[in-house]
Amino acid sequence: EEDLARIATVRKLNPEAKIRIDVNGLWSVDQASKFLERCGEIEYVEQPCASVEELRELKSRVDVKIVGDEILRKSTNPFEVDLQGAIDIVMLKVQPLGGIKRAHALAAHHKLPVVVSSALESAIGINYGLTLAASFQELSFDCGLATGSLLARNVAELPIVDGKMQITRFEPNFDGLETSADRFEWWKNRIMRTAELLR
């Protein structure tokens, strides 16, 4: 009921708002179906149920666009997931999917509209998301990349002007990050090992 009230409040405050909800695969088909029948018009629901089979059943019951996120992102091989009749839109998050090239290849493979979104990264990761988004000739849905404000501190500024962001070259500023030198080295080494594996 709280979630339905929140949606109603957003709709009341801004009737033009595009409303998206993200469930992270936590609903059963019945829960999703009942909620979506009551919530009114939304742009889409992201990963309402966990499995492809559940998503397929839900899609046959409701007239709401369904986005697949975890169903691909957490798969050992997202190219082998059969999305036929299960979702309408693919969620692309650069880092969890293995980089810009792989995310783009995944979109081409599944031949569905995409939403390019962040996985709550710093400005560096969001810049990669912007680069992926810019590589598509056309996007049917707005990107979900305006998440930098959710971080207490960021390594660079990526301003949003009139609802738009620009791909930006910048030198990251790590001074404001609250982390120990040991932890910073651990992350740096992990990134270097990962980069080596991807070569």
Task: Describe every region a protein language model picked out.
Residues 176-199:
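Extended hydrophobic packing segments that form well-structured cores
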Residues 1-64:
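Metal-dependent enolase-superfamily TIM-barrel catalytic cores that perform enediolate-based chemistry
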Residues 20, 37, 84-85, 179-180:
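Intrinsically disordered, low-complexity regions enriched in Ser/Pro/Gly/Gln/His and often acidic
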Residues 29-30, 34, 157, 176-182:
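Short alpha-helical interface patches
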Residues 50-65, 72-174:
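Shared catalytic-loop signature of beta/alpha-barrel
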Residues 3, 122-125, 184:
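Generic structural signal for well-ordered, non-membrane alpha-helical segments
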Residues 24-25, 70-72:
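Short beta->alpha junction loops
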